[in-house]
Amino acid sequence: MAANKGINGGIKNHFIAFLGEFVGTFLFLFFAYGGTQTANQTSQKNPSIVASPDINQLLYIALIFGFSLTVNVWIFFRVSGGLFNPAVTIALCLVGVVGPVRSIFIFIAQVVASIAAAAAVRGLLPGDTVLFSCALAPGTSIAQGLFLEMFFTIELVFTILMLAAEKTKVTFVAPVGIGLSLFVAELMGVAWTGGALNPARAFGAEVIGGFRGYHWIYWLGPLMGAVLAAGFYKVIKFLNYEQVNGEQDLSAEEKQLKDEKKARKKEERRRKQNFAGLFQTGRMHHHHHANTRNATVNDAGDGRPNSAPPYTEPPAQQQTWPHSASTIRENEDFSRFAEMGSQDGIVITREQPAEQYRLSGERYVQDANAQNRAKTP
């Protein structure tokens, strides 16, 4: 039952994305197609293509495409992502933002919606000619048109990847940047290629208005641009481009979380270093204490020191010194002090105040020798 519920939930989500993308693409292209038809119909009586528009037409068409995309992306990005473009869908699939199955649903929705939008504009606006098809301007070769569409699409797709796919503090205004990027590309593209940047935009218009022999450039050009934009995006992500500009893209909450994470790591490293240092200090003190005691006895084994008065084992009451809750004798292992920390690892002689000494085998030996010399007649 759980598996079936998960499968049904996935299908439901794909259907919602399909529906949102269909409606969003339809509205985007309906107003874009309609605006282009309006701009061309007022100045030309019988054109079959959009070719060599004057500056007013160019600005009008670029603005209607840019604003229509901005508004509808802002509406539908919460539902389906607001892609409205098969080239954008493929780019997001390549970088891993949209899954392959979801991409198929969205791709189909975009193509079907483009046909529906073109049919709606054709049927609702007066006139018998489709004036919103994409076509190459006179003198523009097919190769030129192909690469122009590629570069126009790179601009649009890379804007989407950096503003929408990358989650930063300015993601909520990404639709503005996306619409502006389309507007910029249309300012140049409308005059030379019709400014498709979108296979669905070109396909829907030509289904209603008739296909041209070079229609394929409006598929291949944008797809090439999408792949190149996605590839460049992957390269800079691999190179960790975020480190170049520091934390300027982080919100206040993200900066606080990052600072807290750094502080925790720093504290953890400090604790590990302190513990390792205390452990090593305890071992060194233990070995130094044993070596110093051995050095006070000569090689003959008679118990007399090489350059000091004879060593006499101090009485039991002089072998002890205060230490927290227990009494530690001379032959006790000093290495265990490493686990007590700086507070519990205090070693002193009976004659000295506790706050003057810390754990030190060398100091203990010096004090013990001084006491023995003082007691030797």
Curated annotation (Swiss-Prot):
List of glycosylated residues: N40
Annotated GO CC locations: plasma membrane
Stretches of the chain found on the membrane's Cytoplasmic side: 1-14, 78-87, 166-171, 237-377
Transport recorded as keyword: yes
Ranges facing Extracellular side: 36-56, 109-144, 193-215
Gene Ontology molecular function: any one: water channel activity
Keywords: Glycoprotein, Membrane, Repeat, Transmembrane, Transmembrane helix, Transport
Catalytic reaction equation(s): H2O(in) = H2O(out); glycerol(in) = glycerol(out)
Membrane topology: Multi-pass membrane protein
Chief subcellular location: membrane
Chain segments carrying region Disordered: 278-332, 358-377
Gene3D superfamilies linked to this entry: Glycerol uptake facilitator protein
Recorded phenotype for the gene knockout or disruption: Leads to a slight reduction in the vegetative growth rate and a significant increase in conidiation.
Biased amino acid composition, Polar residues: 315-328, 368-377
Protein family per UniProt: Belongs to the MIP/aquaporin (TC 1.A.8) family.
Known function: Water channel required to facilitate the transport of water across membranes. Involved in conidiation.
Free-text comment about domains: Aquaporins contain two tandem repeats each containing three membrane-spanning domains and a pore-forming loop with the signature motif Asn-Pro-Ala (NPA).
Protein's UniProt name: Aquaporin-2
Organism: Botryotinia fuckeliana (strain B05.10)
Gene this chain is encoded by: AQP2
